[in-house]
Amino acid sequence: MGYTLWNDQIVKDEEVKIDKEDRGYQFGDGVYEVVKVYNGEMFTVNEHIDRLYASAEKIRITIPYTKDKFHQLLHELVEKNELNTGHIYFQVTRGTSPRAHQFPENTVKPVIIGYTKENPRPLENLEKGVKATFVEDIRWLRCDIKSLNLLGAVLAKQEAHEKGCYEAILHRNNTVTEGSSSNVFGIKDGILYTHPANNMILKGITRDVVIACANEINMPVKEIPFTTHEALKMDELFVTSTTSEITPVIEIDGKLIRDGKVGEWTRKLQKQFETKIPKPLHI
């Protein structure tokens, strides 16, 4: 038996009831976050909460309690479910009202749901690297909002899956934007490249951590777009996300990235990232 965050309470899973006219269910009218938990501790949780509130504000949803209260509820959820290593998923929808495209009256309250899932770190992918495929980016023009509307990403990820690939690397007119569920980085001549954080991508929390790691090891960073052709010519390539951490990409559409092996700079960044992960408590 598990527990779920439901609005401002932690309740048993079976007590949660989602209304058929919840706007998240009918319109994808809401925002969400995923927080990694290592050894019982939430990783970069404040940054995720900040982004949740920012996304909500961009679509004019007011979350009905403070960030500190939200943090407290997530902490209670992790403890209640005795989560060791895994993640928390949580979302905020505009609420429940008779179906109509325009916003409901202000009396309608947002609906908040959160749950935890135990899952190990993707150590094999981190060590050996993965394959990817290029997919045209058909999503909308506000990818900076972490919206529940994920159909474009779902279709891209499915295409990658059917090709036996881990990730779809999205591009608009051959300019790489991001992955279907990740940010994309390339390394050339010791310089780290990634798409600038504008409306074409989600400004990933792990993306920010990786840029900080690069600064800490004196690795130059350039937030400028690069093309699919340039991606294939990179010395190293990797994708980042809350759950995939720094996952090397060794092949795209059958073409090896350099020699098809995980590169030296990627290993350095992984090592630096490792220093930030909460360690087990020894009593």
Curated annotation (Swiss-Prot):
Family: Belongs to the class-IV pyridoxal-phosphate-dependent aminotransferase family.
Purpose: Acts on the D-isomers of alanine, leucine, aspartate, glutamate, aminobutyrate, norvaline and asparagine. The enzyme transfers an amino group from a substrate D-amino acid to the pyridoxal phosphate cofactor to form pyridoxamine and an alpha-keto acid in the first half-reaction. The second-half reaction is the reverse of the first, transferring the amino group from the pyridoxamine to a second alpha-keto acid to form the product D-amino acid via a ping-pong mechanism. This is an important process in the formation of D-alanine and D-glutamate, which are essential bacterial cell wall components.
Taxonomic lineage from the root: Bacteria, Bacillati, Bacillota, Bacilli, Bacillales
Catalytic temperature dependence: Optimum temperature is 60 degrees Celsius.
Gene name in the database record: dat
Name the UniProt record assigns to this protein: D-alanine aminotransferase
Enzyme Commission numbers on file: 2.6.1.21
Impact noted for substituting residue 178 to K: Loss of transaminase activity and small gain in racemase activity
Coiled coil regions in record: none
